[in-house]
């Protein structure tokens, strides 16, 4: 027997594989160390776990089958499960625009604050060779306090002594433009007066006495206001430094920025107990369900009727009508939404111009809640009916012609055929798709954001809420558009509720399609 030697390609060599794995490990390891050094421990841990699992799967011959499923599983974990877990975790904290720092960082920010005291002295800068001389003017005196020549290139804090001088500095002083350009360097100067007082730059024209606003207590946590003597302690229930009364009880004054703390179920209880949140939340929830339901019913009805029409063999030019009716589905939705926003313009839109010319009507599409909601449903039906029409066109092909021939022999007309044969045979396979469409429109953020921005706004609410807001857009406005600050914790709590609602819809969808779990 002659042995046959198989030649291995260069890219199949094991050394190349291990070289690629080594480079991947080094690069990802560098990213992990970088994230860990920046304090992003969770991201570093997730990256490390995914890297370790990936190396194990792709380097072990016993896990060969997992090589095909691991990318999908890793992607689902990274882009679905990880954000979901983070959102749920944030829902149990007070994380917001004023409570997004750690306790140590918030304390450091407060300790860096300063206040001005004493007399402010006007200053001028005079060039001297490649250096500069600082001259401070003493009010009601002809004397000046002049420094030794110094450089503005130093970026670290520099102590600068000044001395009295009878003769005023001659020469042209630096312009405001030069001072502005060197403001960062001037802010690093600590001017020491002959009496020992220290001054720092307080404006583009003055140096004044600056002192720390707060001093740290012996316990390493409490702060004392050096101006008022007020004592502040960290309140771990609210996430703020809060004033303490003489009796040792909490006062009403708090310091910002605050810090992030775990508050348990308080965000969820706010949705239930706070009337300023409860009322708009319940109203928006009802409107979200109504909007999704009306959209599904309208798109299915229009799509089914149009599908029956374009499939009618006696209709001439069916192919042309079919293409024209599918065109709205081919245009990107955000373009169609912006076009409709112009068409529905209350002052210059073509729709109002037409209605005003024919009937003398000019509906307030964007300021009247009822008209705004009607506009949303109409626009969404326009965007969604082509999808349902395509589905119905395919399902109509599966209906046997014998049924229509038998009904014709019994003397049935088009309407009887539709309601007795077509509709019952179409609605059953459409049910799971209708549930999926309902779930999609439940979170139809793009339509609301581009067309109405949730408006018109509701009056008397503690959170930004509008009459056309869906739960998802309401959550977005709480997280990013709140006038009193961005409340990420409350938004995450509402997002968690939305997740549970959509999850319930998914379960209903699975039951409707008769998928059983072991």
From Swiss-Prot:
The keyword Repeat does not apply. It is found in: Cell inner membrane. This is Maltose/maltodextrin transport system permease protein MalF. Keywords: Cell inner membrane, Cell membrane, Membrane, Sugar transport, Transmembrane, Transmembrane helix, Transport. It is a multi-pass membrane protein. InterPro entries: MalF_N, MalF_N_TM, MalF_P2, MalF_P2_sf, MetI-like, MetI-like_sf. One of its GO terms (cellular component) is maltose transport complex. It comes from the Bacteria. Part of the ABC transporter complex MalEFGK involved in maltose/maltodextrin import. Probably responsible for the translocation of the substrate across the membrane. Belongs to the binding-protein-dependent transport system permease family. MalFG subfamily. It comes from Photorhabdus laumondii subsp. laumondii (strain DSM 15139 / CIP 105565 / TT01) (Photorhabdus luminescens subsp. laumondii). GO terms for molecular function: ABC-type maltose transporter activity. Gene3D superfamilies: D-maltodextrin-binding protein, MBP, MalF N-terminal region-like, MetI-like. Pfam families: BPD_transp_1 (PF00528), MalF_N_TM (PF20872), MalF_P2 (PF14785). The chain crosses the membrane at residues 15-35, 39-59, 72-92, 281-301, 324-344, 376-396, 488-508. One of its GO terms (biological process) is maltodextrin transmembrane transport. Signal peptide: none annotated. Residues 285-509 form the ABC transmembrane type-1 domain. The complex is composed of two ATP-binding proteins (MalK), two transmembrane proteins (MalG and MalF) and a solute-binding protein (MalE). PROSITE patterns: ABC_TM1 (PS50928).
């Amino acid at each position: 027997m002659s042995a046959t030697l198989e030649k291995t390609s260069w890219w199949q060599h094991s050394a190349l594989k291990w070289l690629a794995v080594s480079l991947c490990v080094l690069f990802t390891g560098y990213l992990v160390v970088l994230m860990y050094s920046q304090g992003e421990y969770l991201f570093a841990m997730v990256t490390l776990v995914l890297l370790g699992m990936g190396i194990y799967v792709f380097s072990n011959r016993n896990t060969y089958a997992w090589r095909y499923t691991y990318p999908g599983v890793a992607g689902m974990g990274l882009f679905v499960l990880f954000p979901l877990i983070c959102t749920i975790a944030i829902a149990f904290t007070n994380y917001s625009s004023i409570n997004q720092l750690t306790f140590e960082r918030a304390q450091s920010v407060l300790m860096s604050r300063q206040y001005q005291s004493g007399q402010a002295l006007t200053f001028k800068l005079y060039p001297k060779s490649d250096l500069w001389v600082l001259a401070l003017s003493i009010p009601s005196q002809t004397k000046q306090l002049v420094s030794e020549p110094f450089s503005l290139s130093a970026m670290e804090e520099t102590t600068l002594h000044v001395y009295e001088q009878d003769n005023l500095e001659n020469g042209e002083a630096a312009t405001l433009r030069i001072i502005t350009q060197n403001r960062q360097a001037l802010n690093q100067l600590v001017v020491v007066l002959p009496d020992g007082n220290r001054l720092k730059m307080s404006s583009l024209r003055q140096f004044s006495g600056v002192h720390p606003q707060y001093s740290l207590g012996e316990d390493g946590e409490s702060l004392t206001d050096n101006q008022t003597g007020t004592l502040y302690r960290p309140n771990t229930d609210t996430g703020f430094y809060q004033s303490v009364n003489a009796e040792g009880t909490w006062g009403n004054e708090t310091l910002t920025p605050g810090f992030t703390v775990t508050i348990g179920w308080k965000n969820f209880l706010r949705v239930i107990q706070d009337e300023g949140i409860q009322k708009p939340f319940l109203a928006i929830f009802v409107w979200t369900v109504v909007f999704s339901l009306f959209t599904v019913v309208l798109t299915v009805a229009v799509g089914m009727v149009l599908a029956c029409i374009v499939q009618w063999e006696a209709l001439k030019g069916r192919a042309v009508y079919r293409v024209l009716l599918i065109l709205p589905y081919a245009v990107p939705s955000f373009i169609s939404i912006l076009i409709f926003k112009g068409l529905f313009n209350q002052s210059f839109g073509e729709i109002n111009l037409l209605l005003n010319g024919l009937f003398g009507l000019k509906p307030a599409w964007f300021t009247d809640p009822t008209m705004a909601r009607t506009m949303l449903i109409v626009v969404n039906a326009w965007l969604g009916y082509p999808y349902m029409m395509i589905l119905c066109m395919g399902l109509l092909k599966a209906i046997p012609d014998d049924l229509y021939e038998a009904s014709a022999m019994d003397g049935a007309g088009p309407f009887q055929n539709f309601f007795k044969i077509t509709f019952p045979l179409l609605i059953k396979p459409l049910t799971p798709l209708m549930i999926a469409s309902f779930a999609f429109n439940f979170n139809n953020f793009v339509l609301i954001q581009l067309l109405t921005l949730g408006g018109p706004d509701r009056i008397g609410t503690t959170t930004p809420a509008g009459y056309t807001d869906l739960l998802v857009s309401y959550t977005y406005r709480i997280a990013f558009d709140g006038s009193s600050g961005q409340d990420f914790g409350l938004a995450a709590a509402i997002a968690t509720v939305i997740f549970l609602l959509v999850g319930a819809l998914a379960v209903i969808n699975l039951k409707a399609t008769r998928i059983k779990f072991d």
